[in-house]
Amino acid sequence: SSDLGDFNILGATLSAGVGRSNTDTKTPYNHQLQFRLNAPFTANIDDLAYQPPYLIANAKFVKEDDLGQYYLYEATFNDELAKETEYSAWLDFKKPFNFSNKVNGYIKFGGKFRQKERRLETNRRYRRMDLAEGYEPVFENMPNLTHSEFKSTYIGINDFLDTSFKSNDFLNNKYKDLNIDFALDHNAMRNFYDVNQDAYGKILTSKILKDYNGKENLWAGYIMSEINFGKYITFIPGVRYDFSDLKYNAYSGSNVPDNEDKEHEFEYERTSDKNHYGYWLPQIHLRIKPVNWIDIRLAYTETLSRPDYDLLAPRTIIKPNVNEVVWSRTNLKPALSKNYDVILTFYQPDYGIFTVSGFYKKIKNFTYTRTAYILEGTTTDPTKFDIPVSMAGGSITYPLNSPFDATLKGLEFDLQLQFRKLHNILKGVVFSANLTLMDSNMSYFETLKSRVKNPNFTPGGTEKPFMPVNSEIVYEDRLLNQPSLLFNVSLGYDYKKFSGRISCNYQDGVLVSEQHRQDAADVESTRPFTKWDMQLKYKLTNRFSLYATLSNFTKSSDRRRRDITNYPVRVEYYGSAAYVGFN
């Protein structure tokens, strides 16, 4: 980007600039080999249905240590390029004014143009290796590969093992049954692909499901002012008009395979769609400072958040084998938020600052994905999606804006203390703490697909005995990824050339997967997370310092669970880290 500079014109300031940025995200090599073990369970599978998932792999229930029985089931190679280029230009004009000694400020207006071009290109190659079309060319290219003892025509695992691999305590050794004592060798996997890549079939389905490109032209113009009424009141009103013009291209197909493992050719076409919208976004800020040690701030703002790019890509994916349709267009609206904030700050220059604030947000136009039956004469009538009437009775999945608003409200307390004015041991103490309490509410819209008896059915007639029905239901819960409690505290001490800090960060559990089923068996959330860190620093000279950092020294983990059973879904241990160096 380039700032063209500030220009003084008749007592006003004109600022202008232009910019360009480019981001390429490449995944040039993603090769996966899946080895399987036939019938490893030594217990009746039905008897394991109510066991916690992490106990099913116990040696009492499964035998998986005979490496000779493993065989190569499938091989997948993926590469991906996501590219985004942005051009921008902006212009601001600022003119100060002074009506009297007690009323002064400035007026400011301007605009910005931003053009975004983005595209996603994927490539997928795949082969089932337990079928003749897979293992025959492989053994022809690599005749010395070890065969599986399970079936002599299959490819075994032994030639792919990393002989230098040493297993550590998996997840702090809490789930001993999940420890893996062997791993695949990356070089062996790479060599396998280099030799046999012609045996991998190109999967067209992935390109149709994922690839897209698009262009967004965004214009914004604003006018605002800052008006000071003496030293005690500052009023900042303003408004911005935000206009977006979007055009996206993707692919549609009418005979798409039901998964990404088939290399069938099928007809597809380029699909284009466009949309535009504009919104007025006002903002009002008021600052009141009745005395030197109190600051009161009130604010009302309106903001927007645009939908995910992938949901804007125009696609009509018809999968006749499973009677399903996946549909999307560029007609989604951005999420709009009305924000109210109140902030009270109390100063004491010798000892610190205390702030208490409250906030309230009301958000509409959240985007969600609906899956429902395709039914004539309803909101999922085939003609509304330009799909064949023959798909009626099938299933369609498509994104849309929620008809319900979400709310978020909370209180935040912030305290910062220091005692440098004291003449005792407390002089070096530095303390800070932040507590945020939040409450959110969201209505999650869900369609229940069911079948009811057809009153017009007669044996031998043309009517079917049951009819598909869409029933709408709303589940109330928290906003996704929104904690109800955040707490951060830091305690430090400074003495001459030494400085030390110890800090703790706490986050309450959050909702990560909302309810879709009536029994709520799909709801997932995270456990509360606490992280401790420590930093030490010693100043050697005016230019050099010795420092040491200890991160997450209590080895806290990030845990995700299924609420109805409390069973873990995902557990991540980040471990602890220590750093020592010069600065």
Task: Walk through the language-model features, giving the residues of each.
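Transmembrane beta-strands of outer-membrane beta-barrel proteins
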Residues: L10-A16, G105-G111, F235-V239, P282, ...
